[in-house]
Amino acid sequence: MTMHTTMTTLTLTSLIPPILTTLVNPNKKNSYPHYVKSIVASTFIISLFPTTMFMCLDQEVIISNWHWATTQTTQLSLSFKLDYFSMMFIPVALFVTWSIMEFSLWYMNSDPNINQFFKYLLIFLITMLILVTANNLFQLFIGWEGVGIMSFLLISWWYARADANTAAIQAILYNRIGDIGFILALAWFILHSNSWDPQQMALLNANPSLTPLLGLLLAAAGKSAQLGLHPWLPSAMEGPTPVSALLHSSTMVVAGIFLLIRFHPLAENSPLIQTLTLCLGAITTLFAAVCALTQNDIKKIVAFSTSSQLGLMMVTIGINQPHLAFLHICTHAFFKAMLFMCSGSIIHNLNNEQDIRKMGGLLKTMPLTSTSLTIGSLALAGMPFLTGFYSKDHIIETANMSYTNAWALSITLIATSLTSAYSTRMILLTLTGQPRFPTLTNINENNPTLLNPIKRLAAGSLFAGFLITNNISPASPFQTTIPLYLKLTALAVTFLGLLTALDLNYLTNKLKMKSPLCTFYFSNMLGFYPSITHRTIPYLGLLTSQNLPLLLLDLTWLEKLLPKTISQHQISTSIITSTQKGMIKLYFLSFFFPLILTLLLIT
């Protein structure tokens, strides 16, 4: 056990020297990116040893050796939890980050601030590892906020572009909403459990109230871009492609799912939270799949596929299977990073063209990228014996066998079918057919820093699922025998999506429809959600805020102070200073009656 913990500690501390060297020597040399990449690669190799030892020993370890602060009732210490989730995730995150950094050497070669870019990527990785290994909520919150601020810095990397700055601000604002839930849970647990350690919280609050659980669900929805807090995820594509690959594969977007996995022992006893998680994930996975079906930006298609897979992970947690959700996190990291790399390779070679309608015929000119893109898309769709199949097939089988919401299960199956449809559509429009880009485009994919990381991730997309599945057991054993039609459900919906994509491609080529349907506009405009929330609602709010004070000022105060006040003063003055009432008949009668009385007396 000592060797196990020592090797893990060495893995985590090996990533710190490249950051410290920038403090000592700010004027970094051109070799700094290669140095950072080599450190991450070496750390990945080192991390395999403690992970292998952990699989053999099968014992969790908690390292707690430095006290941060001590109050009268609470003791806060630096604590690392080395269990299935952290020990399996560390090598996956390091492997994917290593490949992305090597890819960045090619993609960001001409960037003048490439050294700072690599430093940001490394800090991004470190904050995610802090989040994964944290054994108390405060330490987890440090990693949580760390990935948030690093995503802001990396999305706005090209700060001269207004869209990049807007996307970065959008990401940080949506995550602030989720952070409200996290801080609410922090406050509740310290008040009721007097601790932020998950073990103590589970012992003292086996059935906590809905308040902290709803806070954790809100935090996960914000960080993992669930429906309602999702618009920042496709907008984050304004950042460089390596940032998109790291953001969507093994760092920020899976942090929310990982939070729910960590606190699943508290949430599993609450049927309401489980149902909310299930329904939120199901709606998200369907909505994202529908939006991806009609997008034309290759990076946004992959981004919406990430949102759809995050919804599927939420569904898995909702059916009380956190181990399967974690399995899907690990398998998803390989082919999602590779899909972004292939997209970046295509975009870079086509002179920053991202519209798939202006591509085509790349299978012959970019064979390795095309092959890897096909493997990644098929793995995303859940094609048998690729990495994605091992997790998606288990998830769908478990959902079919669970006493769960039939509505949520149905739309999850529809979303799985649509995943196959938009993956096939991307392959057909990008790689097949006649070239639709300028003929003088110089395409070259012979750079080793481009090919090697894609090859590694392609191997991971082929074999990683089989290797990881054998080391992650579900929380409860599967039913040993199930009907054949349930066993083939995942395969059936995958092939149904494939046929749907072929049919849509045929309709597009033959122009069977002269004008798009309303459903097309709903899908292409992302359900009109950004237009309503980012344009209409703020406009109405600002218009109301403008009109209300103006009307109050004009109709109330200005009119009351000047015209009405003067009029009231004049009326009151005339009433006080004058007894003339304007009653002529009464005045005449009052004059006439004394005259008559006088005449009567005289006579």
From Swiss-Prot:
**What would you give as a GO molecular function for this chain, any one?**
NADH dehydrogenase (ubiquinone) activity
Reported effect of changing residue 253 to A? Found in a patient with mitochondrial complex I deficiency; uncertain significance
Q: How does it sit in the membrane?
A: Multi-pass membrane protein
Query: InterPro entries from the xrefs?
Result: NADH_DH_su5_C, NADHpl_OxRdtase_5_subgr, ND/Mrp_TM, NU5C-like, Proton_antipo_N
Note whether Nucleotide-binding occurs among the keywords.
no
* Localization (cell): Mitochondrion inner membrane
According to the record, the segments passing through the membrane are 38-58, 87-107, 122-142, 144-160, 171-191, 211-233, 241-261, 272-292, 301-320, 325-347, 370-390, 407-429, 458-478, 482-502, 582-602
What are the GO cellular component annotations?
mitochondrial inner membrane; mitochondrion; respiratory chain complex I
What changing residue 447 to S does, per the record, is: Found in a patient with mitochondrial complex I deficiency; uncertain significance
Query: What are the recorded Gene Ontology BP terms?
Result: aerobic respiration; electron transport coupled proton transport; mitochondrial electron transport, NADH to ubiquinone; mitochondrial respiratory chain complex I assembly; proton motive force-driven mitochondrial ATP synthesis; response to hydrogen peroxide; response to hypoxia
| Pfam families for the chain | NADH5_C, Proton_antipo_M, Proton_antipo_N
Record keywords:
Disease variant, Electron transport, Leber hereditary optic neuropathy, Leigh syndrome, MELAS syndrome, Membrane, Mitochondrion, Mitochondrion inner membrane, NAD, Primary mitochondrial disease, Respiratory chain, Translocase, Transmembrane, Transmembrane helix, Transport, Ubiquinone
Q: What is the effect of changing residue 465 to E?
A: In LHON; primary rare mutation
Q: Does the keyword Translocase apply?
A: yes
Enumerate the catalysed reactions. Answer: a ubiquinone + NADH + 5 H(+)(in) = a ubiquinol + NAD(+) + 4 H(+)(out)
This enzyme's EC code(s): 7.1.1.2
- Subunit text: Core subunit of respiratory chain NADH dehydrogenase (Complex I) which is composed of 45 different subunits.
Q: Which family does it belong to?
A: Belongs to the complex I subunit 5 family.
Please name the disease the record associates with this protein.
Answer: Leber hereditary optic neuropathy: A maternally inherited form of Leber hereditary optic neuropathy, a mitochondrial disease resulting in bilateral painless loss of central vision due to selective degeneration of the retinal ganglion cells and their axons. The disorder shows incomplete penetrance and male predominance. Cardiac conduction defects and neurological defects have also been described in some LHON patients. LHON results from primary mitochondrial DNA mutations affecting the respiratory chain complexes. Leigh syndrome: An early-onset progressive neurodegenerative disorder characterized by the presence of focal, bilateral lesions in one or more areas of the central nervous system including the brainstem, thalamus, basal ganglia, cerebellum and spinal cord. Clinical features depend on which areas of the central nervous system are involved and include subacute onset of psychomotor retardation, hypotonia, ataxia, weakness, vision loss, eye movement abnormalities, seizures, and dysphagia.
Role description:
Core subunit of the mitochondrial membrane respiratory chain NADH dehydrogenase (Complex I) which catalyzes electron transfer from NADH through the respiratory chain, using ubiquinone as an electron acceptor. Essential for the catalytic activity and assembly of complex I.
**NCBIfam families, per this entry?**
NDH_I_L
Please identify the protein, giving its name as recorded. Answer: NADH-ubiquinone oxidoreductase chain 5
